[in-house]
Amino acid sequence: MTDTQNKNYIIALDQGTTSSRAIIFDRDANVVSTAQSEFVQHYPQAGWVEHDPMEIFATQTACMTKALAQADLHHNQIAAIGITNQRETTVIWERDTGRPIYNAIVWQCRRSTEICQQLKRDGLEEYIKDTTGLVIDPYFSGSKVKWILDNVEGSRERARKGELMFGTIDTWLIWKFTGGKVHVTDYTNASRTMLFNIHTLEWDQRMLDVLDIPREMLPEVKASSEVYGHSKSGIPIAGIAGDQQAALFGQMCVEPGQAKNTYGTGCFLLMNTGKKAVKSAHGMLTTIGCGPRGEVAYALEGAVFNGGSTVQWLRDELKLINDALDTEYFAGKVKDSNGVYLVPAFTGLGAPYWDPYARGALFGLTRGVKVDHIIRAALESIAYQTRDVLDAMQQDSGERLKSLRVDGGAVANNFLMQFQADILGTHVERPQMRETTALGAAFLAGLAIGFWSSLDELRNKAVIERVFEPSCEEAHREKLYAGWQKAVARTRDWEPHENEE
């Protein structure tokens, strides 16, 4: 432990979908410097999305060098590296050369849809849900691995001989940073592959057989907070978590019933369920997060399709606002939405409805409705959808929501945060540090090497900037929410199904 006493910094590598970032934290968890580098998105066909793994590694290395230079630090002052990454994105490379045999297939890519349809036809939905906690979807890594092995000649045979390696982005980066010495992933990333038994915490042989994926190519799976190996310059790599789970840990949601919402284009909600892997009756995913010391804790995950994108629609298509920041001002000009509800089912409805045939609608229009009411209804829709998901999570888990921690771009909107607290009837806690994903990776790495000694010490670092307390009567809250549920019901099943056209 003494070695870390002279090393006062931790570097978090945040490898995202559109850019690589490096953030250096000091012992008080303050950001000392950050560097960011975007990379190319490849769209070879409609619905296909790829990245160049070598470019990801190059941008991530460059960011690390740049962040160190900006802070005037040398690598021997860094106590550890923590890694957080875009989840599910799949890389296969040669063990001997470290060269990928194909581009990385990104989580958004839909090319393996037919493979997933076949899994459904084979009656595997219940088995996959029970074993991996996931639904059958091209989103997850398993079908992407099969697609590469099916389409790159000779690759399956080479994988059987141990010549090829599979990894999600964390695994790929660690392999490169350690000079090909360490082939490892953590439980949070493994839980997103559709190949991992989340109960036994082992790769699932039946899923490997079904998808014809040789076990020889899979990484070892370890806890999210331990020393996995060292970079070529000798820095311990000591923390790994997928981006949403890293944010959950960075928000210190380590006890059952603690939840966070990341408000982005859509919303990502995760609720810690502790030692209990809860099977959802509402289409939530059962996934692995981190407990107080980075050990396995289970979580429920739900996604809202249209959050910030609803505000973008007001700005870009309807031209009602010039800037997303203006919504707070306009929403505050009226005392309520005047009975207006906007259901932003532009691409159908996500959790807990899962209705691809729903379409967006505005309800409750009268001659007295102004632009301000519509803008307010758009913001309120984000809070209502968040409640939809959190209510379902509470029903599934039997855990009462203790409070909601929030991060992402929209948390700067005080109107939205206050309305969120009102409609949930619970505290909404906004952290001072907005870099919660990177902070989670730094916390996990720091705990592993004794840079930070305890959870209490971390809690003191994860400072809450503002708490929004519910200010509305329960009867009024439930009346508003009943109106939302009525509006949602009327958007359902709008689009004709294929066989009806």
From Swiss-Prot:
Its EC number is 2.7.1.30. Belongs to the FGGY kinase family. Key enzyme in the regulation of glycerol uptake and metabolism. Catalyzes the phosphorylation of glycerol to yield sn-glycerol 3-phosphate. Pathway: Polyol metabolism; glycerol degradation via glycerol kinase pathway; sn-glycerol 3-phosphate from glycerol: step 1/1. It catalyses: glycerol + ATP = sn-glycerol 3-phosphate + ADP + H(+). GO terms for cellular component: cytosol. Keywords: ATP-binding, Glycerol metabolism, Kinase, Nucleotide-binding, Transferase. ADP binds at T17, R21, T265, G308, G409, N413. It is an enzyme of class 2 (transferase). Sn-glycerol 3-phosphate binds at T17, R87, E88, Y139, D243. Glycerol binds at R87, E88, Y139, D243, Q244. ATP binds at T17, T18, S19, T265, G308, Q312, G409. NCBIfam families: glycerol_kin, PRK00047.1. One of its GO terms (biological process) is glycerol-3-phosphate metabolic process. PROSITE patterns: FGGY_KINASES_1, FGGY_KINASES_2. This is Glycerol kinase. It comes from the Bacteria. InterPro entries: ATPase_NBD (IPR043129), Carb_kinase_FGGY (IPR000577), Carb_kinase_FGGY_CS (IPR018483), FGGY_C (IPR018485), FGGY_N (IPR018484), Glycerol_kin (IPR005999). SUPFAM superfamilies: Actin-like ATPase domain. The gene is glpK. The lineage of its organism: Bacteria, Pseudomonadati, Pseudomonadota, Gammaproteobacteria, Pseudomonadales. Pfam families: FGGY_C, FGGY_N. GO terms for molecular function: ATP binding; glycerol kinase activity. The keyword Nucleus does not apply. Inhibited by fructose 1,6-bisphosphate (FBP).
